[in-house]
């Protein structure tokens, strides 16, 4: 998976693919949590993906990334 590739190698292209694949989920979740504030939702999405980049190596190999991103977005909001 792209997550395991990124966690193993730190590959920027793999991370960009992760962001491209999951950005809409994270942004839409953030937008709902901040009552439609687009600027704040964008900031939250950046924070969530920054956290993912920092924590990818420590996530269990069976992590369901969409679930992790959703929960982390809710937690950050």
Protein language model regions, located:
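Structural recognition of an alpha-helix C-terminal capping motif at a helix-to-coil junction
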Residues: 43-50, 63-75
